[in-house]
Design a protein with these regions (language model features):
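Intrinsic low-complexity, intrinsically disordered or marginally ordered coil/linker segments
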Residues: 1-7, 34, 82
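Structured binding/interaction patches within domain cores
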Residues: 60-117
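A charged, amphipathic interaction segment
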Residues: 92-153
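N-terminal interaction modules that seed assembly of large macromolecular complexes
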Residues: 35-70
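Short amphipathic alpha-helical segments and their helix-coil junctions
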Residues: 20-43
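Charged, compositionally biased N-terminal leader segments and the immediate start
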Residues: 2-26
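Amphipathic alpha-helical segments within well-ordered protein domains
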Residues: 39, 54, 87-88, 118-122
Length: 153
């Protein structure tokens, strides 16, 4: 049984988690540096935003149960996935300006998804510890040996 004072010291305060804006900017930098690698997560049926969040939590030493984030993922993917499919199928049929507007809307949906994931995270009781969030997620997707393996903490 853990000492209660140790548990209190290991607890992650809400202010220690990234704000939606900070996470959006951090994600843009990390994703932009290796977009093709991160897109492999999506190609395997995963969520890039979730993978980025799990990577960030690994960097901070904050383990999380993937099932705790599942409701947020289901809620946001229900909107994002069909929109992404519509945008891709419309690319050949719409003008460049319309396509860019669709892409901009998709980015707003991505940002919304990040916000919902972060809000869900803030509702959890989180503790510092050994964290293998990204490895666990990539393993579920069958991608633990893929191009992102060097990011696993």
């Amino acid at each position: 049984m853990r000492n209660l004072s140790l548990v209190a010291n290991d607890a992650v305060a809400e202010h220690e988690l990234p704000s939606p804006l900070d996470f959006w900017h951090w994600s843009g930098e990390v994703y932009g540096a290796r977009s093709q690698d991160w897109l492999q997560v999506q190609e395997l049926g995963g969520c890039v935003n979730l993978a980025l969040l799990l990577h960030r939590l690994d960097q901070c030493g904050i383990p999380v149960d993937l099932t705790d984030l599942q409701p947020a993922l289901v809620q946001t993917e229900a909107v994002l996935t069909p929109w992404r499919a519509l945008r891709k199928s419309a690319k050949a049929r719409v003008g460049e300006q319309e396509y860019q507007a669709m892409l901009a809307h998709e980015l707003e949906l991505e940002r919304l998804q990040q916000g919902v994931l972060l809000q869900t995270l803030r509702e959890l009781s989180l503790y510092r510890g050994k964290s293998h969030n990204l490895l666990n997620y990539l393993s579920l997707l069958g991608a633990q040996q893929g191009p992102l393996r060097d990011l696993i903490c």
